[in-house]
């Protein structure tokens, strides 16, 4: 199975403004995702980091990735996250409507975190 997992507010504390370096990991949630990885599932971390500041730019995802990919990759490593892919460029939005979506608190409550 393939899982696409957000970062801020999902596996770490939400950040205010541009303070991504201040995010603190939620170890129980990371352990849940790592277990899925260990069971052979494909894990992609997909984040909107940096997208708000470039929202009107057609190259927003490229610019966000150039600005924050290294920091985000290092955080995932430092936090012990196991994954297959890291993608920056998730559109900045207040609400996502998706036929395969699940609210993160519901997912982690159902999976023992």
Q: What residue ranges belong to the model's regions?
A:
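Catalytic phosphate/metal-binding cores of nucleic-acid and nucleotide-processing enzymes, i.e., regions
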Residues: 1-113
């Amino acid at each position: 199975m393939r899982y696409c997992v957000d970062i801020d507010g999902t596996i770490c504390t939400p950040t205010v403004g541009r303070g991504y370096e201040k995010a603190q990991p939620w170890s129980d949630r990371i352990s849940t995702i790592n277990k899925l990885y260990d069971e052979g599932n494909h894990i992609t971390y997909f984040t909107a980091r940096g997208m708000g500041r470039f929202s009107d730019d057609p190259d927003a995802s490229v610019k966000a990735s150039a600005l924050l990919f290294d920091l985000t990759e290092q955080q995932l490593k430092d936090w012990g996250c196991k994954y297959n892919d890291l993608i920056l460029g998730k559109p900045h939005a207040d609400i996502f409507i998706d036929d395969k979506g699940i609210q993160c608190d519901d997912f982690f409550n159902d999976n023992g975190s």
